[in-house]
Amino acid sequence: LVEPSLKMTPQHDGKVRVAMTLDACMGKTDHRILDMLVKEKIPATIFVTARWLKHNGEALAVLMAHPDLFEIENHGENHVPAVDKPVSIYGIAAAGSEIAVVQEVEGGRQAIVAATGLQPQWFRGATAKYTTSSMATINRLGMRVAGYSVNGDGGSLLGAAMTAKHIAAAKNGDVIISHINQPTHEAGEGVVKGLLALKARGVIFARLDDPSFAPPGN
């Protein structure tokens, strides 16, 4: 299995840029994070599943009300790993075939179009692991695969202090992954603290639609 990395093309102007990406897998919305992003005007890319969209209309309305801050991208239909062979990853059964990968990607895309009118450009599968052939399938469907370079919250399982430390340590060009669908987990508090620390350092926050992510890449 492949776990692709993603970083921004550096701009040599002495400024530090990072991209915050947040996965909304299923379940609820962590308003500690969402409300802070709005209040502090921190741009972020939110990867949503069709399952999450179905139950989080209020949070979606907040995202849609701030197009200057939030880019909405594709996290799949049912949070099934986009892997075209029958394996289990972190206890989650993978899609298992090319047809099932297409369904996961397209189901997510169609849900985003229906809910927002926007066409997603990026796809991140559940667990962020793929095969080289499933990545080729995703590209063939017109989507780029969104890797990352800093794992902020360890799948939302880390404590607040460790999550904050990971995020605050991000360097120029890093793409951070964390979660925005676990309001009861300590990690969410760490996401907030880590992002505020980056902001205090004068870091510029980018989204995946930034020109720094122009192809070539995934």
What are the roles of these predicted feature ranges?
Residues 82-89, 157-161, 186-192, 217-218:
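Histidine/acidic-residue-rich catalytic or RNA/ligand-binding cores of hydrolases
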